[in-house]
């Protein structure tokens, strides 16, 4: 299909957005947004949406940016469609002071930048997809921070679509609900979105990876906090008396199957992921995330955590290990499988733009998981980005433009 806007629009937006720090903070997960800086991008987007004709664009109390675009002539009676992306970036890599730049990639190692005199590079051995990107212009960070394509690429693509419609309102589309959510990276992105006011029958998140990804299955997810209480005794008098909480953690961690760690799993294989641990002789705390697409296997993983704690307590003859499980989200396939038309239409939109759709299980979660269970079926589309959550993150310029084309084709099919 022909581009109806020049590529610099989506690119210019993306380059601006990634320079606004929006890292969420898991330590503040009891408040939304977890970081005040998310309001900085939220306010920019709301103002830009108003400039593009979305008169009701606003930033709600918890940093949700919401706006509505009227339907094109003849599509006024069609159900409203939502397009959703998230404001925040992950805190697992440096995210403030992003300095994006464009690398014309000619093959071999992709060097994003240089830090402390050393190149920050990604090899084709580690990322074979680079072999298909020779001669492409790639947006990278300078190697000292993540880029923020997750999910500011999705934000920019949605905003560029809105700009196209503002320029030519005759482009076919139903009424559109636009939403940019906070705190997706810490699992709270869709919790406080007012679905009734949003007013959409269906929605798509634009939060995937390389262009063509189409996802309607995600993990079942929980967080397990395991606490170990020790008993400190002078090590010279410790025999039969000391309980070392740090060693208890080591024993516990060894009871979880190492082949079910993220670095050994792929596809539909679930995992236990140790996100952090602090330990002394007296006290230790370990935080795991537990993931599996299959609900029964997911429950088995949670049961094994409880069983490991019980085994250690039984060995010690008293309770030194406690487990707290916090459910995070469920596999949205339970809901979305009843709406196959959402998958079919997305495939058609990709194909119309010359992109081969790749239907894959999400090895993670999106805002669409929560929204689907709250009554808004919501598959996930690609953004075009690669290597999320790290300093090697990048996105091809052509993918930013092509995904905007895909969104244009998508909304036309709902008109």
Can you annotate each of these PLM segments?
Residues 127-130, 136-149, 183-306, 310, ...:
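Midchain, well-structured core segments that form catalytic/ion-binding scaffolds
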Residues 26-28, 56, 170-175, 258-273, ...:
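Flexible, glycine/charged-enriched surface loops at secondary-structure junctions
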Residues 29-78, 82-84, 88, 99:
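A non-catalytic alpha/beta surface segment that caps or lines the substrate-entry region
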Residues 7-35, 140, 329, 389-390:
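N-terminal capping segment at the start of a domain
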Residues 247-264, 271-273, 320, 330-378:
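Active-site-adjacent substrate-binding region
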């Amino acid at each position: 299909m022909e581009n109806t806007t020049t590529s610099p629009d989506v690119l210019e937006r993306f380059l601006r957005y990634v320079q606004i720090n929006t890292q969420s903070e898991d330590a503040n997960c009891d408040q939304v947004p977890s970081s005040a800086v998310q309001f900085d991008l939220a306010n920019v987007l709301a103002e830009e949406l108003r400039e593009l004709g979305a008169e009701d664009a606003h930033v709600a109390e918890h940093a949700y940016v919401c706006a509505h675009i009227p339907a094109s002539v003849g599509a006024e009676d069609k159900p409203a469609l939502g397009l959703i992306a998230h404001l925040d970036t992950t805190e697992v890599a440096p995210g403030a002071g992003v300095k994006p730049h464009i690398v014309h990639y000619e093959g071999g190692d992709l060097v994003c930048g240089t830090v402390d005199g050393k190149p920050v590079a990604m090899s084709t051995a580690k990322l074979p997809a680079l072999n298909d990107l020779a001669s492409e212009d790639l947006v990278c960070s300078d190697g000292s921070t993540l880029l923020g394509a997750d999910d500011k690429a999705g934000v920019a693509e949605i905003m560029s679509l809105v700009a196209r419609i503002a320029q030519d309102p005759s482009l076919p589309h139903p009424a559109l609900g636009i939403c940019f959510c906070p705190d997706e990276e810490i699992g709270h992105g869709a919790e406080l979105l007012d679905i009734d006011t949003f007013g959409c029958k269906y929605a798509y998140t634009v939060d995937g990876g390389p262009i063509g990804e189409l996802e309607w299955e995600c993990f079942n997810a929980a967080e397990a906090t395991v606490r170990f209480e020790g008993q400190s005794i002078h090590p010279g008098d410790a025999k039969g008396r000391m309980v070392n909480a740090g060693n208890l953690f080591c024993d516990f961690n060894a009871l979880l199957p190492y082949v079910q760690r993220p670095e050994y799993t792929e596809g539909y294989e679930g995992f236990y992921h140790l996100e952090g641990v602090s330990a002394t002789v007296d006290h230790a705390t370990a935080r795991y995330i537990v993931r599996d697409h299959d609900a029964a296997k997911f429950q088995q993983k949670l049961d094994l955590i409880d069983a490991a704690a019980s085994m250690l307590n039984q060995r010690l003859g008293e309770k030194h290990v406690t487990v707290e499980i916090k459910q995070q989200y469920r596999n949205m396939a339970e809901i979305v499988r009843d709406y196959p038309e959402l998958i079919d239409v997305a495939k058609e939109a990709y194909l119309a733009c010359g992109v081969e759709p790749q239907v894959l299980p999400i090895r993670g979660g999106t805002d669409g998981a929560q929204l689907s269970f709250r009554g808004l079926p919501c598959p996930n589309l690609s953004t075009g980005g690669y290597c999320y959550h790290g300093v090697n993150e990048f996105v091809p310029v052509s993918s930013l433009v092509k995904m905007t084309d895909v969104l244009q084709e998508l909304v036309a099919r709902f008109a």
